[in-house]
Design a protein with these regions (language model features):
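Long, C-terminal-biased catalytic regions of enzyme "large/alpha" subunits
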Residues: 1-134
């Protein structure tokens, strides 16, 4: 669908200020999330992690930083490995059964979904997301 202001096709979720595929810094995303204060709800800052936090302390400090900047709603999203037995884990080998990772999953609206079950458009959208290493 053509955006009336931009005059071109511009895909964005209704609960975000910056598209997930936009090549911008995580700080720009955080600053944009301050606009959520002017909404009645339904807006959320998605931080797509290219890798997990190195420690609990790193995750905690970053989360406190978001709160101190006035971000109301946010979600850390990272790819999760899945083996053929449908166990989810991080890494190359399943921590439950020892089988290798054969698929990736990602949280979509609060639940885990396998990438290989995505429709073409969702696969494309996921490939275009800007991922961050924090």
């Amino acid at each position: 669908k053509i955006d009336k202001v931009l005059g071109k096709d511009y895909y964005i979720y209704g609960n975000q200020w910056i598209p997930l595929k936009e090549n911008t810094s995580v700080l720009n995303r955080i600053d944009a999330a301050k606009l959520d204060n002017f909404c009645g709800g339904g807006a959320i800052l998605h931080i797509n992690l290219g890798e997990n936090f190195n420690s609990f302390e790193d995750a905690w400090n970053f989360t406190v930083g978001l709160a101190n900047k006035g971000v109301k709603y946010f979600s850390y999203i990272s790819l999760i490995d899945i083996c053929d037995n449908d166990h989810s884990f991080f890494g190359d080998t399943c921590t439950v059964c020892g089988e290798p990772s054969t698929s990736k999953g990602i949280k979509i609206v609060g639940y885990l979904v396998k990438q290989n079950s995505f429709k073409k458009q969702r696969k494309q959208e996921l490939e275009e997301r800007q991922m961050y290493s924090l």
